[in-house]
Amino acid sequence: MRKIIHVDMDCFYAAIEMRDNPRLRDIPLAIGGSADRRGVISTANYPARRYGVRSAMATATALRLCPHLTLLPGRMEVYKSTSRQIREIFSRYTSLIEPLSLDEAYLDVTDSPHCNGSATRIAEEIRRTIADELNLTASAGIAPIKFLAKVASELNKPNGQYVITPEQVDDFLLALPLEKIPGVGKVTAKRLEERGLHTCADVRVYALADLLKAFGKFGRVLWERCQGIDDRQISPDRQRKSVGVEKTLAQDIHNWDQCENLIEQLYQELEVRLKRVKPDLHIARQGVKLKFDDFQQTTQEHVWPMLNKQDLLKLAQQTWQERRKSRGVRLVGLHVTLLDPQIERQLVFDWG
């Protein structure tokens, strides 16, 4: 049985700013772009979250919720440097580290000799070391499989950890609400509820064929997760190839203005997600996806060197006009393809 730890730093960017400027600690604080430039929030500290301020929220909305919010533009080089320090701490315990972003990673400590092989104690030691050496807090989840480790890391935030032992997996899953499973958003959760599916226990007695019919490939993933199946390995050399966001609509849309408004919202979330893995926003391509009311879908991409909202809007409108054919649209998505690391290094060499 594997021993997987998911480590998630607590409001990482904001925590670094509070560490470096203690006067910021007890006031609502967010990192993001300015409201007059249609900026978006990257992260917020816990005092700001009490006012409803969240990541991927428009800065203007955040300031309406919390007029006395302190807004900082962020220091990406500092965040990247700190992330490297955190990864070095991880490497003291295992070489099997899979970074998900600057502030989040999976660790496989199955064969680690540290702490007499106790994943719980390794997680405690890692969190304590991060606090002692970097003056930052981290939360952790410990479980035999990846997705449960990620779920567990959310259960005792901030500055805590939660353990799901192999013996506890089945009971934990039976009671787990489906919206807690990564990949189950609000619309999917509602569609599941309409079928009487609220927890993993409900899915276990539901026909796999019906899940596949209703949810496609994700139906199988959902069924497997509810059975406690997640065979994904920790991939230390894994290079993220793309970043995307999409939204399944409760009701189909039929006019471009509705689609344009949705893309404006999705773009803000895409920008936040991309900054976590590629702070300079350099990319290889960006694209749009539309899924129609007959469940057919289309994707169009455009070679572009940097995330660009106007280009995405133009591409989306072209896709809408050329491929919709009067059909309703039930899903809108945006995505970027990242530069191959070898190509990116060559560009730096050629032009640096």
From Swiss-Prot:
Q: What's the EC number here?
A: 2.7.7.7
Which co-factors does it depend on? Mg(2+)
Active-site positions, per UniProt? E104
- One Pfam family in the UniProt entry: IMS_HHH_1
Q: How is the cofactor bound?
A: Binds 2 magnesium ions per subunit.
Alphabetical GO CC annotations of the entry are: cytosol
Disulfide linkages recorded for this protein, renumbered to the chain, are none
Site positions per UniProt: Substrate discrimination: Y13
**What are its GO biological-process terms?**
DNA-templated DNA replication; error-prone translesion synthesis; SOS response
| PROSITE patterns named among the record's database cross-references | UMUC (PS50173)
Q: What does this protein do?
A: Poorly processive, error-prone DNA polymerase involved in untargeted mutagenesis. Copies undamaged DNA at stalled replication forks, which arise in vivo from mismatched or misaligned primer ends. These misaligned primers can be extended by PolIV. Exhibits no 3'-5' exonuclease (proofreading) activity. May be involved in translesional synthesis, in conjunction with the beta clamp from PolIII.
Q: What is this protein called?
A: DNA polymerase IV
